C-alpha cells in the first residue's frame, strides 16, 4: 500500500531524449511528493534529479536492427533484471519512458502482477504496426501522449491516454529571437541563411547529404548572397558529411555547426530537413521548411505498405493538411527541393504573404501543444497513483 507522502516511483529511460523527459518528470513529481524515492534505469540528468539507477542507461541505447541483433542477449538479460528488481521492490508505479520494445514487455509483466504502469511517449502506432495497440492496452494503466492526434487514436481503441503537450513546445519561445540565435552562432544577422539538416543517423546522412547539397548549389546560383548553415549532431556525422561534400559539392561554402540545430533554424530564413523530430522543432522555431526523405528502395517499398498516415512530417500530421512540402524518395531530388525552397526565399509580396501565413499556422500549432508537459505528466502520474483515473482528458 502506498504511503501518500513517500511513494516508490520506478522509471526506465533508454536514450538521451528519455533521460531529459525523466528528469523533468522527477522534478515535477517532487513538488507533489517531496519524500518520494525514485529507482530504475537513468541517464545523467535523471541521476542528478535523484534517481537511483540499476545500470548505465547507455546499455539500452542501441539503434537499428543490426545493433539490436548484436546486443540482444545483453538487452534480454537487462530486461529480466529490471523485471525481477521491480517485482522485488514493488514500486507504487512504474513509468516506461519511450523505448517501447524494451519497456512495454516490462510494463505488461508488472501490471499483470498488480503494479500500476504508465507508458510515457506514445510509440508511432498511429502510423504503422497498429496491432501493437492491443499490447499497449494490456501493458499500461495510462499512455502519456505528446500530440493530440495520438490521443484521438487511442480513444478509438478505448485505451486510456492523456495528451500532455510537448516538452519541446515548452522549451521554445512562441516568438523566437533571431538576433539572439545569430549571436549564439557568431553570425552576421544582416546576412541571409538557409538551414540544412540532413538527420542524425548515418543512413540519413548517406541518403540525404547529396540531394540537399546539390539543391544548395542550385539556390546559390539563384541567390548568390545566400549562406548555408549545416548543424550536425556529433563528430562522426560531421566527418561523414564532409566526405560526401568533398565529392559532390567541393566548391560550395557552408557553415558546419556541431549541434545548435535550433539556433540555426531560428537564424535561417528557411530550412531543408529530414523528416522526424527536426520537422517539429523547425515548426516551433517558425522556420518555413521543405521536408525531404530517402531510404533504401526495399525499405521504401515496405514503408509504403505499412505506413497508414497521409503525411510523414509532424507539422502536416498536426495540422491534418499539407502545410509544408514533403518530397520522398524519387521526388527528393535537387531540382524539386530547390524549387520549393525558392518559394520561401523569393522576395515578392505574394511569397512574403504566404510565408507570414505559414508562420501564423506554426504559431497556432505551437500554442496547441504548449501545455507545460512536465507538470501535466506529473499530474497524470499522481492521478494514477491515487487511482483518480476516471477522466483521462
From Swiss-Prot:
Keywords per UniProt: Glycosyltransferase, Lipid A biosynthesis, Lipid biosynthesis, Lipid metabolism, Transferase
Name this polypeptide is given: Lipid-A-disaccharide synthase
GO molecular function: lipid-A-disaccharide synthase activity; phospholipid binding
Gene Ontology biological process terms in this record: lipid A biosynthetic process
Range of residues in the leader sequence: none
Cellular compartments per GO CC: membrane
Reactions accelerated catalytically: a lipid X + a UDP-2-N,3-O-bis[(3R)-3-hydroxyacyl]-alpha-D-glucosamine = a lipid A disaccharide + UDP + H(+)
Keyword hit for Cell wall biogenesis/degradation: no
NCBIfam families attached to this UniProt entry: lpxB
Gene: lpxB
Pathway membership, UniProt: Bacterial outer membrane biogenesis; LPS lipid A biosynthesis
InterPro entries (UniProt xref): Glyco_trans_19 (IPR003835)
Primary role: Condensation of UDP-2,3-diacylglucosamine and 2,3-diacylglucosamine-1-phosphate to form lipid A disaccharide, a precursor of lipid A, a phosphorylated glycolipid that anchors the lipopolysaccharide to the outer membrane of the cell.
Family: Belongs to the LpxB family.
One family name in Pfam for this protein: LpxB
Record EC number: 2.4.1.182
Superkingdom of origin: Bacteria
